Regions:
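Short pre-active-site segment immediately N-terminal to redox-active cysteine/selenocysteine motifs
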Residues: 89-91, 95-99, 165, 175
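N-proximal helix/coil linker or "cap" segments that precede and/or mark the start of modular domains
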Residues: 33-70, 139
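Conserved redox-active cysteine motifs that mediate thiol-disulfide chemistry
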Residues: 87, 95-112
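Hydrophobic membrane-insertion alpha-helices, especially the h-region
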Residues: 15-31
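A short beta-strand-turn-helix
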Residues: 65, 70-91, 117
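N-terminal Lys/Arg-rich, disordered targeting/topogenic segments
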Residues: 1-11
């Protein structure tokens, strides 16, 4: 009888909720996809918005000059591109990894943004897998039903673009200057991002 009473005391709302929260935290810790999904839900309620510079017809977009060095990437077909050869194009460049929860969370919004510009010869997307594992990245894109173009680094990346934090997103103007730099996950479905790219692409 005493044992039954002890069991009833143990099965309190407080104890059960503590167990549920502990399990949830452990799942978030060990399953980056679940954590990514949680962040994605928060994006839908207006959190994790990118800090896009204000644009007006009367003022130019503030920019930072491009680093004076070659920046090379290899695409999924094995072709190497030089960033300096892409002058005349607005470059949306994202540094990510398949195991990074904020990267996973923001990918669908970047994919939708890419869909708007994939046929625009003046805008280019470069999704850089920082681990340099092309096959794993392509498998990730296929599994998530994403059509983003994957690249890996073929040389040193200037710290002005990427200093180790993931995800990192930069947007370069048509002259190769740094017009936007954001650390951490963000919702790139925000109309301000589209307006910003459109302004740069004019």
């Amino acid at each position: 009888m005493k044992r039954l009473e002890d069991n009833k005391k143990w099965f309190t709302f407080s104890n059960i909720s503590t167990i549920v929260m502990t399990v949830f935290v452990l799942i978030l810790f060990f399953r980056p996809e679940v954590k990514g999904l949680v962040i994605q839900r928060l994006m839908k309620v207006g959190l994790f918005q990118p800090d896009v510079p204000e644009i007006s017809e009367a003022s130019s977009v503030p920019v930072q000059q491009a680093p004076n060095q070659q920046v090379l990437f290899t695409d999924q077909k094995g072709n190497t591109i030089n960033l300096s050869d892409q002058k005349g194009k607005v470059i949306f460049m994202n540094f990510w990894a398949t195991w990074c929860p904020p990267c996973i969370a923001e990918m669908p919004s970047i994919d939708k943004l890419y869909a708007k510009y994939k046929n625009n010869k003046n805008v280019m997307f470069i999704m850089v897998d920082v681990d340099g594992k092309m096959e794993a990245s392509l498998a990730f894109m296929k599994k998530k039903n994403l059509s983003l173009p994957v690249y890996i680094s073929a040389g040193a990346i200037p710290k002005e673009y990427f200093s180790g934090s993931m995800p990192t997103t930069v947007i370069l103007d048509k002259f190769g200057n740094l017009a936007f730099h954001h650390l951490g996950g963000a919702d790139y479905g925000n109309p301000e991002v589209t307006a910003f790219i459109d302004k740069l692409a004019k």
